[in-house]
Amino acid sequence: MTNLKEVTFEKPSYDQWQEAAVKQLKGKPFESLLTKTIEGITLEPLYTEERLLEALDGKLEEQVSTVRALKADGDFGVAQQAFGSSIEEFVAQTNDAFARGAQYVTVGKVSFEWDEAALKQLAALIDTHKQVVLYVDNKEVVNVFNFVTDKTVTGFIVSAEPVELTDFANVRTLNAHTQTVHYEGANATQELAIALAQAAELLGEDFAANEDKFFASFAIDPQFFMEIAKIRAFRVLWKAFAQAYGVTSPKPVQIVTETSLRSFSKLDVYVNLLRAGNEAFSAVIGGADVVTVHPHNVLTGPTNQSVRIARNAALVIKEESHVTKVLDPAGGSYFVESLTHDLVKNAWAYFLEIQATGGYTAAQAKIAADVKVVWDKRLADVETRKAVLVGTNNFADATEEVPAESFVDVNRLAQPFEKLRVDFKENPVKVAVLAYGELKKIKPRTDFVTGIFATAGVTADVTEPFTDVEAAKNYLATTDAQVVVFSAVDEDVEAVLPQIIASKQPGTLLDVAGKFDIDGIDGALYAGMNIYEKLEGIQTSLKEVQR
């Protein structure tokens, strides 16, 4: 009898694995397993130690050690924003947050004015709790330091504009602020390069003199592994950046993060919980020093409950995941290390392009143009469902209305579909799906059609499946629906649809489910199409008919 402890298995090579994978693809090319990210990085289906070492030219250990050397420890600070309709409510929320695990007095957008009385109460909070993060939405809030008496408080002033602050040596004010370009559409490569370009201007000629005042801030997207790699890559880039100043051993660089609102939606807002939790976890694993989790309903106005849930998302990661017990928990992952390397290489190249243009300020036109290309690609991916916003461009609830309230206004990918809902509510459209054939065969196409209209807040009426051409003609001739979509299997589309087109009433739009080109129809709904343009086009066409 064979002793299982003595059984050995031959380790297959990458080529052997690839050969086996191709056989399973049943005629599809191996390249179908590759995925290109919006950064232009090609994701492989398998990462191995050998291929990683080859890609890094044997410098894997150097990359890992750099990431770890430039992170002070494995912990992170919970910076949960307080809101409130008054300074008194803001103070109460902040004190409650500290009692429940928050570590920074965190200020962002509020719905009251920062007058002298409010600033004095905020200053008292900072004196009490000793740590502060100011997300500068209103420049007046920076004046709080005129009233802070404890000059040893620590913290960060997160601002797109440089802030001068004397007497507070432990408050960092030189911020490589990438949130602005993030909301303009920038990808991870661009954010990293722009952070370096900003750092070059902020630090000037004397790296050592300004190092203790510098930090970088990033908004973290839902692309889990890419965002982990983004934070790690910045530390590798920071070492190279410091070496350009002749500093071989820079101090750990501080990184402040906030969950991104770029993928947030006013629709199906509880999905924002998942987005924010995912983003927060990737920030922590990537090595963020400070994490702010935005409430799921921050777009329309946060509540005490949503603020508590957001804070608890960070606290659960901090207290229950144990990732803070490890320095650089993602280190050594072939996939993450490969992504980190690709981002470092590409971001440094783009940084040099910016510097060749004259630096960050001089390169504003170039940066804006480059970032717009990426934003347009992001929008196109959402509008064609290549990228899915659950509850917004797919799996949407047709009965949900877009809240009119607006508390935070940033560039978001969901906005076109939110606008569609408003348009279709103001100009209602009756849509019917003319089902033809056996139900179980046509249901996938029918559901696809109803799902598309649901993204605009339209509940499409689906007929009982017809099996008789004359009955289908009669329905088309008598329906009060303004838009009718014919849904059937391919054979029935080609055989039946041409026979019933003539029965269409004037002013009725007749479309087909599936990518067909048939004379007499107004259009088609199919996978991969730009559903936003299609739905917007329906509105435009019906308005023209009404005129």
Where does each model-flagged region fall?
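Catalytic alpha/beta active-site cores
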Residues: 1-223, 302, 439, 443, ...
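Intrinsic disorder at enzyme termini
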Residues: 7, 28-29, 34-35, 44-46, ...
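Structured core elements
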Residues: 42, 79, 106, 133, ...
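Active-site lining segments that contact anionic ligands and/or coordinate catalytic metals
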Residues: 213, 250-252, 288-290, 348-351, ...
